[in-house]
UniProtKB/Swiss-Prot annotation:
Organism: Bos taurus (Bovine)
Keyword field: Acetylation, DNA damage, DNA excision, DNA repair, DNA replication, Nucleus, Phosphoprotein
Subunit relationships: Component of both the DNA polymerase delta and DNA polymerase zeta complexes. Component of the tetrameric DNA polymerase delta complex (Pol-delta4), which consists of POLD1/p125, POLD2/p50, POLD3/p66/p68 and POLD4/p12, with POLD1 bearing DNA polymerase and 3' to 5' proofreading exonuclease activities. Within Pol-delta4, directly interacts with POLD1, POLD3 and POLD4. Following stress caused by DNA damaging agents or by replication stress, POLD4 is degraded and Pol-delta4 is converted into a trimeric form of the complex (Pol-delta3), which consists of POLD1, POLD2 and POLD3.
Protein name: DNA polymerase delta subunit 2
Keyword RNA-binding: no
Biological process per Gene Ontology, one example term: DNA repair
PTM notes: The N-terminus is blocked most probably through acetylation, as has been shown for the human ortholog.
Keyword Glycosyltransferase: no
Length: 469
């Protein structure tokens, strides 16, 4: 792939100076469409209740679930609402899951004066053997029992269950199904290799020198300032860069300053100011050479709730001079040369990880495709805007590349759907800790990591810059 294109390294590096320097034109993106309009907030009203988003989610998802249930259990299966259930009658019910979890953090429990409890310590996972699943529709709710994996499922998932209601007021599940992968438009065939670089978690302002070195080396590789002619030719095939959130370090939050007296902080400067200036300079170097899409993340200066709105251009006075810089939403979706990308900065996957038994980030990505929802745990355990007309997190169509940022390690996987869908799943690692980014080949949908964490003799077979698969 990318590393294989860097040819004749030793010859060009050790050759005498030449009067003519080779130049390589950037391989351009022929067609590009930003499809993130559903995630842009116009009117911002937080006076509405969150019940509306669950109601509209169920209304939008019900036709998909009914169709899927009839495919799985036969066209003659009875599909009923909870208020129509009869004890002992086998039928199918479509509803939204609520997962009752005794370990789930609760602000009401923490501030309770009656119990005088200590604050619950943070945990990596909040699942417990006593967790229960409750299915809700527009009118009623019922507890689920039987053949269903309680630990894996999360609140907000819309699914269809097959079984019967018992005399004890519980629903005995025999089988269940999700909406499945959405329909997918075929990708346009490409005759040449061109790459999209995925990077997340630059973590600027964290104080790590190695992270800054790796970031600058990454910029130099993409802009063609590093390596021999073969590597510069390879870098010219990077047609676009997507920065998937957490551009600033969590150390820049400076939340302790809120509790300090004003006279102690009058002449101090927020830790994020210098980090934003540094980010502006990095974006300036990148956008002068290649189109760049910048997604916000958990620690970046924008709204906390999903969908996160684009970073304000006034923070980047240098980089915004270039039209190649595009400040986008989180989640972000776009079509690049006929290949549909959809990705997040990782909050949705991290939240599902905490409240589910699923351990692998790629498994969670695939599971969200199966349930046809980007972030089912929002707004229960993950903040989101109180939508009421439509739920923008439902997959309208299946992407070709589906990624999440800020994962502990790199991972990629191609899955096939029942209707010939082909999806590349990518876990983009946190760059500040792994010094690793990802290259996606638009022609073949192959993915490889590109690492800047080590330099030495052991990297000779990977090109000295970690440009290996």
């Amino acid at each position: 792939m990318f590393s294989e294109q860097a040819a004749q390294r030793a010859h060009t590096l050790l050759s005498p100076p030449s009067a003519s320097n080779a130049t390589f034109a950037r391989v351009p993106v022929v067609t590009y469409t930003n499809s993130s309009q559903p995630f842009r907030l116009g009117e911002r009203s937080f006076s509405r209740q969150y019940a509306h988003i669950y109601a509209t989610r169920l209304i939008q998802m019900r036709p998909f679930l009914v169709s899927r249930a009839q495919q799985r259990w036969g066209s003659g299966v009875l599909v009923k609402k909870l208020c129509e259930l009869q004890p002992g009658e086998k039928c199918c019910v479509v509803g939204t899951l609520f997962k009752a979890m005794p370990l789930q953090p609760s602000i009401l429990r923490e501030v309770s004066e009656e119990h005088n409890l200590l604050p619950q310590p943070p945990r990596s996972k909040y699942i417990h053997p006593d967790d229960e699943l409750i299915l809700e529709d527009e009118l009623q709710r019922i507890k689920l029992e039987g053949t269903i994996d309680v630990s894996k499922l999360v609140t907000g998932t819309v699914l269809a269950v097959l079984g019967s209601a018992g005399d004890d007021g519980k629903f005995l599940v025999e089988d269940h199904c999700f909406a499945g992968l959405a329909p997918q438009k075929p990708a346009c065939p490409l005759d040449t290799d061109r790459f999209v670089l995925l990077v997340s978690g630059l973590g600027l302002g964290g104080g790590g020198g190695e992270s800054l070195l790796g970031t600058q080396l990454l910029v130099d590789v993409v802009t063609g300032q590093l390596g021999d002619e073969g590597e510069q030719c390879s870098a010219a095939h990077v047609s676009r860069v997507i920065l998937a959130g957490n551009l600033l370090s969590h150390n820049t939050q400076s939340r302790d300053s809120i509790n300090k007296a004003k006279y102690l902080t009058k002449k101090t400067q927020a830790a994020s100011v210098e980090a934003v200036k540094m980010l502006d300079e990095i974006l300036l170097q990148l956008s002068a050479s290649v189109p760049v899409d910048v997604m916000p993340g958990e620690f970046d200066p924008t709204n906390y709730t999903l969908p996160q709105q684009p970073l304000h251009p006034c923070m980047f006075p240098l980089a915004t001079a270039y039209s190649t810089l595009q400040l986008v939403t989180n989640p972000y979706q776009a079509t690049i040369d006929g290949v549909r990308f959809l990705g997040t900065s990782g909050q949705n996957v991290s939240d599902i990880f905490r409240y589910s038994s699923m351990e692998d980030h790629l498994e969670i990505l695939e599971w969200t495709l199966q349930v046809r929802h980007i972030s089912p745990t929002a707004p229960d355990t993950l903040g989101c805007y109180p939508f009421y007309k439509t739920d923008p997190f439902i997959f309208p169509e299946c992407p070709h590349v589906y990624f999440c940022g800020n994962t502990p390690s790199f991972g990629s996987k191609i899955i096939q759907g029942p209707e010939d869908q082909t999806v590349l799943l990518v876990a983009v690692p946190d760059f500040s800790t792994t010094q690793t980014a990802c290259l996606v080949n638009l022609r073949s949908l192959a993915c490889q990591p590109i690492s800047f964490s080590g330099f030495g003799a052991e990297d000779e077979d990977l090109g000295g810059l970690g440009l290996g698969p």
